């Protein structure tokens, strides 16, 4: 079972919040106190809250649920992509486009365009175009890949979103709320926990902390997917 210990979190610097002057009072229940002008997060709260979130992630994955990892901050971007690919899930790591969830119909059309361009680039269509037209299409494809590459095979809305940095990704959280999609989020001391179903109070800037969250989340998802596979095999054997 995916679990994270107090020691893991201390070593990764999960407890270091933001400077006290930037705090959000809604995070008061999760703050241990100030130290040298920085708020220290109470890991006695974070550890059980995160482990509870991991149990739920495993459950969602075991029901063949789609999990969308969201992290567009520079410190999170590449790690979010790697984590999602590692557990065969989906990601947005460049920029959240408004309506990515709430206007899925339009997003689906853009994904279709991206896949059409990918096919054209591989089947020789680009070679028949003028250099200028081929360049225009290549640039369009690269731009779409940057924005939608992580969700092009999602096939529909996700069953949950896992967010690194609630303040930075507030639009994604709001869209998920509007659609009733459960939100798991790392919430730092300068952020609001509003709209987050599974609040994980913690540092959302330190790369070691981000790696810890994502490593545990991917393990939880993989465990859930393995349960799903085992269940399918049991049913197949019974038939």
Curated annotation (Swiss-Prot):
The keyword Secreted does not apply. GO terms for biological process: translation. One of its GO terms (molecular function) is structural constituent of ribosome. Keywords: Ribonucleoprotein, Ribosomal protein. It comes from the Bacteria. InterPro entries: Ribosomal_uS2 (IPR001865), Ribosomal_uS2_bac/mit/plastid (IPR005706), Ribosomal_uS2_CS (IPR018130), Ribosomal_uS2_flav_dom_sf (IPR023591). GO terms for cellular component: cytosolic small ribosomal subunit. The keyword Ribosomal protein applies. Belongs to the universal ribosomal protein uS2 family. This is Small ribosomal subunit protein uS2.
């Amino acid at each position: 079972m995916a679990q994270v210990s107090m020691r893991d979190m201390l070593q990764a610097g999960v407890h270091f919040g933001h400077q006290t002057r930037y705090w959000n009072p809604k995070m008061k229940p999760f703050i241990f106190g100030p130290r040298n002008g920085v708020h220290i997060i109470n890991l006695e709260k974070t550890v059980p809250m995160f482990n509870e979130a991991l149990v739920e992630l495993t459950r969602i994955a075991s029901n063949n649920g789609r999990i969308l990892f969201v992290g567009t901050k520079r410190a999170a971007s590449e790690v979010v992509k790697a984590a999602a690919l590692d557990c065969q899930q989906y990601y947005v790591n460049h920029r959240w486009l408004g309506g990515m969830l709430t206007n899925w119909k339009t997003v689906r059309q853009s994904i279709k365009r991206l896949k059409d361009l990918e096919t054209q680039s591989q089947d020789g269509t680009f070679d028949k175009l003028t250099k200028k037209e081929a360049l225009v299409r290549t640039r369009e494809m690269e731009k779409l890949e940057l924005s939608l590459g992580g969700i092009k095979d999602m096939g529909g809305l996700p069953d949950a979103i896992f967010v690194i940095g609630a303040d930075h990704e507030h639009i994604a959280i709001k869209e998920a709320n509007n659609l009733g999609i459960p939100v798991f989020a790392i919430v730092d001391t300068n952020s609001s926990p509003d709209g987050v179903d599974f609040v994980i109070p913690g540092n959302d800037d330190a790369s070691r902390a981000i790696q810890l969250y994502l490593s545990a989340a991917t393990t939880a998802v993989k465990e859930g997917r393995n349960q799903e596979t085992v269940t399918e095999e049991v049913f197949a054997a019974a038939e």
